[in-house]
Amino acid sequence: ALPLPLIHNMSAVAFIDMMEKSKVLEPKYCRELKDKLVYFFYGKPSYVINTHNYGNAGDFYAPVCLLFDPKKVAIHKAFPFDTGGFLKRYIKANIYGDFSLKEFELDNTYENICDYIRTYFGSNINYYLGKRVWGDKVSRTEKIHYCLLNMLDSSLDDERVRTIEISSKFACGLR
């Protein structure tokens, strides 16, 4: 599988503000991971639509997806789901056990991420669609990981549980 683009999601109002100021996506402090990071989803957009809109905000909060070349973004950490949702226990699978985030961390190379997609999804298309596959040539450790990840496929969870999250410590400029 070839590397897919990285996608950063933001609201339209945040995008307009950034474009008027610096045209640079700057690392922001993450309380959960206690570091300044820029977050991306690997290969597909993933965001939650605000269902608690108590007024007409127009298009201010419409999602904007920025695409980045993976060769130009240094990976700090990679996880097979949205870490914020996991740590805030929005991902319902975490009710089955007190798993630490570290147990799910992927090696931070694009080669490893492509291997992960081949192992658990079979292809980039299946990954994009969120369709897991079960390969018969996986190791015991991979089977355990697959079972843990399979819990994340609960219908109670949204698309962020099937999307690889990548963080970087470096700013990303826009053309």
Write out the residue ranges for each language-model feature:
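Active-site-proximal loop/hinge segments that shape catalytic or ion-binding/gating pockets
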Residues: 1-38, 46-175
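Short, conserved catalytic/metal-binding motifs centered on acidic residues
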Residues: 43
